[in-house]
Amino acid sequence: VEYACRDDFGGNLDEVSAWAGLHYFASRTGEAANAERDTVLTWPQGNGKLVELLAEGLADLRVNAMAFGVEVTNGTPRVKAIDAHGEAFEIEARAVLLCLPRFVARRLLDPAKASPDLVYSPWVVTNLTLDELPPSPGVLPAWDNVVFGSDTLGYVNATHQSLASVPQATVITHYETLCGQPPAKLREWMLTQTHAQWCSRAIDALAAPHPNLREHVTQADVWLWGHGMIRPTPGFIWGKTREAMQSATPPVFHAHSDMSGMALFEEAFTRGERVAAELRAWLG
């Protein structure tokens, strides 16, 4: 359970809402009518496939631009943005939907209307390119591999489904969520560590199943997610802060798993459906 709380909520048992843990694990007993319980639904593009499907229904889509401000004047929202060439522009709309975590959204909005600070868990993701995945004692490597007794979250093997009969180059992705101290303090500490230190940290964490892993590493890429996922801290799920986040504030609307307090795809999907209904009702 400790591992699952770090993996799904970004915190230790004492840092996570008991209700969130019970709700999440109680909801994982469903079984498909046409598949085994351990069947995984994936696409070669990953979640990019879902983005492509969602984009198909949009008639006027402008990409490669970044919004940096949202202002509402006399009831009319305007989005300030900048394109890939550095040119600034504005979009005037009847309504604006921000599908963003609140720590980002609050930087686009009037500070007086922004959400209060929420608790976000820092994550570190390390991609190790290997000339081959070295053998390990015990069971054969799976797609998602957890190291017993480790504080990290294990690794994912990119070529797990390969049908190759001989060892081949691969990429394994090592995940670690930092917890046990205030997130702000952990973010400060993250920035003091060098690339070499992060690489060694990941390799050392996988030394138990792969003692000679370091000999097979040809490249290492590290990414620090300072606000990797919202953490459902004790009291947050049924507290006034999250309750206030549910209220629509036309003409600016929000849709994100932050509003549920759990960084899960199912929660994000639900928030998208709900805000679509709110938008339709408000726009008439």
Language model segments and positions:
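Short, internal active-site loops enriched in acidic
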Residues: D8-N12, F68, T73-G75, V222-I230
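Aromatic-acidic/polar surface patches that form glycan- and anion
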Residues: T39-N47, F89-I91, D117-V119, L191-C199, ...
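Mid-domain catalytic core of redox enzymes
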Residues: V63-I172, E176, P209
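Conserved flavin/dinucleotide-binding core of flavoenzymes
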Residues: P135-G284
